């Protein structure tokens, strides 16, 4: 069978995990992709540096892992990465932000109306430090009151004695 143009992926990958793109700017990008007859938008939504999409019931992913700033324990935000994120309350920074469930549904609908398929990527099990740290914060939040809830989504094995250093100098991902 010969392939028609409709079978070809003309794609754009956007890494919003490391450098967040606000919804309005993402919608503009979708318009540009449509203008150039591109048909796939690959969104890199998570990585070691951040988590960018709301998951109902796991608010720590966005309350903690969508922000970078000064911290000693990463219970409120993640360490700055790639020179971004010195102030976790700066909503204009490329380091901070996430798409709410409603935002993400709007993005999907907007893209579909322009014949663009969105491929959301959640990078696991590797490159999961943002999720790991968020679930550690969740563990700390509940361990004194509800051990079952504290451990339900825990991604850390406290008995693991592995020693390593990632490319970003992390020892816990």
Model-derived features: positions:
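Aromatic- and acidic-residue-enriched carbohydrate-binding clefts of CAZyme catalytic domains
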Residues: 49-113, 128-173
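Short loop/turn motifs at secondary-structure junctions
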Residues: 4, 37-39, 57
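Domain-scale activation on soluble regions of proteins
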Residues: 17, 117, 124, 129-132
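A conserved hydrophobic secondary-structure block that centers on an alpha-helix together
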Residues: 15-48
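Aromatic/hydrophobic pocket-lining residues that form π-stacking "cages" and hydrophobic walls in ligand
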Residues: 29, 107, 118
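Short acidic, glycine/Ser/Thr-rich loop/turn "cap" segments at secondary-structure junctions
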Residues: 10-17, 88-92
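Hydrophobic faces of well-ordered beta-strands that scaffold small-molecule active sites
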Residues: 10-14, 41-43, 118-122
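Short, small-residue-biased leader/transition segments that mark boundaries at the very start
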Residues: 2-9
